């Protein structure tokens, strides 16, 4: 497995390696994409350290995939991969998203502004703890807050221009008073 740190720039996590499946090096793979079969078309995947993984075989089993990676020939080697997150470079992904769909990597770093254009901070992360997506926002003050990534709180997302517009009240950043 080759090492390539350059591929980690603007990466998108597509899968997480799970437990071994059988004795010949296959692993269960939790795919984080809505189109699991597309995973093999991306070619080489990379982990956090830049090591590469080439899919030799992929077949679906319920919500998971069973995958065989080149060079992983036994259960012990497969077990050593457990928990590794697999990424692809953002520029390899197809841009066939709908108007309300975004890749997480495209949201991180966007300026956050209110309806008047006042810059409040920038997006520093995206989370989902089960009740809906939350944007992590680093305010201009240095404080970090979570805001709902909903149509009520986030009024506009403009990836090309590098900003998103929030309603400070709906986002929980203001109580609606004048000094906010």
Swiss-Prot record:
Gene Ontology CC annotation, any one: ribosome
Gene Ontology molecular function: any one: ribosome binding
Keywords, sorted A to Z: Chaperone, Cytoplasm, Ribosome biogenesis, rRNA processing
Domain of life: Bacteria
Localization of this protein: Cytoplasm
Residue spans crossing the bilayer: none
One Pfam match: PRC_RimM
Residue ranges of domain PRC barrel in the record: 99-172
Annotated InterPro entries: PRC_barrel-like_sf, PRC_RimM, RimM, RimM_N, RimM_N_sf, Transl_B-barrel_sf
Glycosyltransferase is among the record's keywords: no
UniProt cross-references to NCBIfam families, sorted A to Z: 16S_RimM
Subunit structure: Binds ribosomal protein uS19.
Family of the protein in this entry: Belongs to the RimM family.
Name of this chain's protein: Ribosome maturation factor RimM
Organism: Bartonella henselae (strain ATCC 49882 / DSM 28221 / CCUG 30454 / Houston 1) (Rochalimaea henselae)
Gene (UniProt): rimM
């Amino acid at each position: 497995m080759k090492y390539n740190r350059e591929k980690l720039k603007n990466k998108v996590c597509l899968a997480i390696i799970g437990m071994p499946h059988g004795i010949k090096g296959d692993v269960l793979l939790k795919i984080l994409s809505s189109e699991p079969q597309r995973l093999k078309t991306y070619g080489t995947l990379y982990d956090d350290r830049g090591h590469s993984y080439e899919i030799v075989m992929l077949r679906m089993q319920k919500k998971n995939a069973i995958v065989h990676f080149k060079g992983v020939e036994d259960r012990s080697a497969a077990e050593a991969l457990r928990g590794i997150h697999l990424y692809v470079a953002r520029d390899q992904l197809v841009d066939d998203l709908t108007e309300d769909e975004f890749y997480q990597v495209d949201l991180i770093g966007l300026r956050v502004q209110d309806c008047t254009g006042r810059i409040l901070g920038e997006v520093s992360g995206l989370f989902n703890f089960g009740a809906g997506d939350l944007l992590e926002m680093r305010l201009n003050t240095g404080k970090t807050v979570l805001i709902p990534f909903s149509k009520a709180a986030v009024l506009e997302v403009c990836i090309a221009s590098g900003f998103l517009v929030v309603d400070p009240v709906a986002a929980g950043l203001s109580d609606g008073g004048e000094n906010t």
